[in-house]
Amino acid sequence: IKMPDEIRSRYGLPLIGLIRTETDVRKGLDRWIERMRKSRWGSGDTEENVGAMISAMNLPRLLLCMEGVGEKLDITAKEVCVHAGCLTLSGSLYQNGDLVANAKESDGIILIVEIGGTDYITVERELEICRMQDVTVKGVVAIG
């Protein structure tokens, strides 16, 4: 996934939050591209804000499913779970059948994806499993 807008346009899912994790100072063309991204998408949300938005849904049994692998994704997902007490962190549904059973019993799932780190096939497989098992996808949290 290259841009947060793709989540809405390609999959029709609401974007709950965009968490910016890049803190390095870029130079030259990369710096200009980063400024253009910030002007289009904003500066991003904090983990506390995203946790508060998820808590405001008033759904006590939500699963936060991580799509992809990476230290940045793992750390940010744990921070969001801390700030949203209603969340349970899990991996991808297509990797574990027990997670599918947990997702069916929950109020829904929220996908957490990494911009530039999560591929389309992973998200599409996850959404296909959710459609087959009647699991509601409440939205997506993007990390970039």
Task: State the predicted function of each range.
Residues I1-G91, I115-G144:
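Short boundary/hinge segments that flank catalytic cores
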Residues N96-G116:
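Inter-motif core of Ras-like GTPase G domains
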